[in-house]
Amino acid sequence: MTIADNKKAFFDYFIEERYEAGIVLEGWEVKAIRAGRVQIKEGYVVVRDAEMFLIGAHISPLQSASTHINPDPVRTRKLLLKADEIKKLIGKVEQRGYTLVPLNLHYTRGRVKCEIGLAKGKKQFDKRETEKNRDWDREKARIMKGGVKE
């Protein structure tokens, strides 16, 4: 079940490969995610010392969050991947033009997982072409349905 999607990533990048990673979360973050108070549009993934971290994802704390902790909505969260997957991704990210972006948050067997994508940035004309194709697909669907009036 999907919790949050990053639609902006599909508009700004060509997604070449996808990986599923676990996330190290605190208790208040899990409760807030279950309540749907998460936004990953501004998030990105970095590699530090052969470990991966999700930066910029915003998890808004609930009002009922504990009083003895100070919740940080945009803290850096560690991503959990297998060592060989991390090595493979490090090699590909070091190539020019590749980056790692979070695509969505979802549940797998009751655990919150983050799907990350190996992505290459789109140029402005690529974005315009994507928009034209999307509009044409909508228009085709409308024509096939018989809803065009001239």
From Swiss-Prot:
The keyword Membrane does not apply. Keywords: Cytoplasm, RNA-binding. Residues 124-150 are annotated as: Disordered. It holds the Pfam family SmpB. InterPro entries: SmpB, SsrA-bd_prot, SsrA-bd_prot_CS. It is found in: Cytoplasm. The keyword Transit peptide does not apply. It comes from the Bacteria. GO terms for biological process: trans-translation. GO terms for molecular function: RNA binding. One of its GO terms (cellular component) is cytosol. Belongs to the SmpB family. Required for rescue of stalled ribosomes mediated by trans-translation. Binds to transfer-messenger RNA (tmRNA), required for stable association of tmRNA with ribosomes. tmRNA and SmpB together mimic tRNA shape, replacing the anticodon stem-loop with SmpB. tmRNA is encoded by the ssrA gene; the 2 termini fold to resemble tRNA(Ala) and it encodes a 'tag peptide', a short internal open reading frame. During trans-translation Ala-aminoacylated tmRNA acts like a tRNA, entering the A-site of stalled ribosomes, displacing the stalled mRNA. This is SsrA-binding protein.
